[in-house]
Curated annotation (Swiss-Prot):
Family of the protein in this entry: Belongs to the ATPase alpha/beta chains family.
Compartment list: Cell inner membrane
HAMAP family hit by this protein: ATP_synth_beta_bact (MF_01347)
Membrane topology value: Peripheral membrane protein
Protein's UniProt name: ATP synthase subunit beta
Catalytic activity: ATP + H2O + 4 H(+)(in) = ADP + phosphate + 5 H(+)(out)
Keyword entries, A-Z: ATP synthesis, ATP-binding, Cell inner membrane, Cell membrane, CF(1), Hydrogen ion transport, Ion transport, Membrane, Nucleotide-binding, Translocase, Transport
Subunit structure, interactors included: F-type ATPases have 2 components, CF(1) - the catalytic core - and CF(0) - the membrane proton channel. CF(1) has five subunits: alpha(3), beta(3), gamma(1), delta(1), epsilon(1). CF(0) has three main subunits: a(1), b(2) and c(9-12). The alpha and beta chains form an alternating ring which encloses part of the gamma chain. CF(1) is attached to CF(0) by a central stalk formed by the gamma and epsilon chains, while a peripheral stalk is formed by the delta and b chains.
GO molecular function, one term: ATP hydrolysis activity
Amino acid sequence: MSQNIGKISQVIGAVIDVEFEPGKLPPIYNALRVTNPAIDDNENNLVLEVAQHLGENSVRTIAMDSTDGLVRGQAVLDTGKQISVPVGRKTLGRILNVIGEPVDEMGPVNADKEYGIHREAPEFVDQSTKVEAFTTGIKVVDLLAPYARGGKIGLFGGAGVGKTVLIMELINNIAKQHGGFSVFAGVGERTREGNDLWMEMKESGVLDKAALVYGQMNEPPGARARVALSALSIAEYFRDEEGQNVLLFIDNIFRFTQAGSEVSALLGRIPSAVGYQPTLATEMGELQERITSTNKGSITSVQAIYVPADDLTDPAPATAFAHLDATTVLSRQIAELGIYPAVDPLDSTSRILDPQVIGEEHYAIARQVQYVLQKYKDLQDIIAILGMDELSEEDKLVVARARKIQRFLSQPFHVAEAFTGSPGKYVELKDTIKGFKEIVDGKHDDIPEQAFYMVGTIEEAIEKAKKLAV
């Protein structure tokens, strides 16, 4: 088959128009290749993805790398297929870019199989309808805002409250307890953070259980708008071909939308609300619908969500919320108390915190814990003004238990062992429920609150109390 070659007719930033001979237009989503001397000395080093057909013989494409150095009339090769990325176990421990090339200087990936990045969501008949909780081993999450297997979790939090550490602990727990793999998509985030994550994962020994796909802030919008899809294809392979329960991390889902909005105007689309692309909900839906449980395995995704100007009604975060099953909110106030993970127990929510899914006992204890913490929050103003002595005996008891619960919600992480000096703890769900039940029932009213800080199970708290008493 002869090669289909076109030529560049127009370059507008990240958007390139390419002219082909009549009747030889490449289909939408096809990958085209062109040589850009400004990137490096390799031939056909720039990938363009067909986004629109213009008239008889022109296509409008989005570039996946820098377009500086391109000129009109340059030859463009149609590869005849969409952007494909290597999949399978060879991708574990590697860093890939949007087009599946390794960027960790550790040689080629040599995978046996490739997947296209645009794939159909699983058919209804293949999807699993069973709703079950996904145990993470992190007490605060499992008790108060449990994750659903094959669900989507939004991770909210400002800078420096522990999003990355929480993500790394989840990767660690999935690898060690469930033997599963994780895929991390760095979408439009800081390159330094991407490097830090790689280094920390290497040090904590979880790197060989995860594949990393990066399209960071310095990349053109084309790469940032597609890198989440590349990572998702790698995760889909582990789910569909190996029957794994995969964890997919997307940091940050807002940047996916932001990149789409950057190229949307260049593609000639009329902007919609707040200047976002008119296809915002469709693009988000195409990505999110592929993240699901099937009869073979599941992809559970944790997505960090940046909220522009803290406005939750902004179209970008608002569209993402529509797809979420659970939210984990990290709070600076809790981090300031030294309680890590700094998850806000009253602000975090889950769709499966429901007695029909998690059982009556778990549900009742979670609600009791929330009640005690809420009551303590309501009493804090009185305590600040009048002091503890002005409270009734009943309220004093509530405050004492709430402070114990607050500390018992903290937990030493495996990935933070190097910094904290205490060994990490994975807490089974039954132990979590038992521990909080005993605190709420008043079985440990005699134990000092510091005994509950940074321990795993309630037995450890009792042991710690004995040591403190000596």
